[in-house]
């Protein structure tokens, strides 16, 4: 066989195979499958009032805002937006679910937080595992399981998801260097042990990429344990554009294809000199699959 003939015939199945792979990776469904919300960080450096922010978000196509106050919720609703996630478990990044000495007050606060969520139409209540301060991961997991077992019944009764957020312990600037939930596997293990449809994790893709990587496989294997998602560019926690290492448009397609129905919240900060509204418009379209 002549060299030219051989190369032509050999290339044909290769091209066909690559085309098939790309076709398989491209979502066939229409855009708009993900509900997008924002955290306050996206407005850094702006002077818009809360109502003006809501009007801008609604115009772009966003569906919610994370961590509004109870007083802000009516303004959200007047603009066709919803609270994506609420706070109110008595936990913090310093003192969280793993502190046994705080379990009584965490239980009381979480019941009130669940009631608040139910009253404003929000299905997600954030709960923070907290700092280790010398505690082993095993003891911390046992303590988290213990308090979550105490609140899961009420969460199930009210239909509210209590979710733990993963944070990385590597980047000093994030000020989360001693968090116990700094690898996805720790939180998934806790969820499996609690075994409740209302105890899940907030999968923060910025933190998870730094902590573990392997984002899409983790999503595919654990989507049933995820009730909320945060996004920001890696490194730097800025926009989710082509100036950082993750392909968020592809990741968004994976999330949508898995049938995920929760919010995907933008938690980036605009890069120096960038206009927040224009960045919101661009980043919204990146996740619009």
Give the ranges of each region predicted by the language model.
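Active-site-proximal loop/turn and secondary-structure-junction residues that shape catalytic pockets
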Residues: 42-44, 69-71, 89-92, 131-133, ...
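Histidine-acidic metal/acid-base catalytic patches
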Residues: 2-58, 121-123, 181-203, 207-289
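Active-site acidic/histidine proton-transfer and metal-coordination neighborhood
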Residues: 10-17, 30-31, 95-200, 210
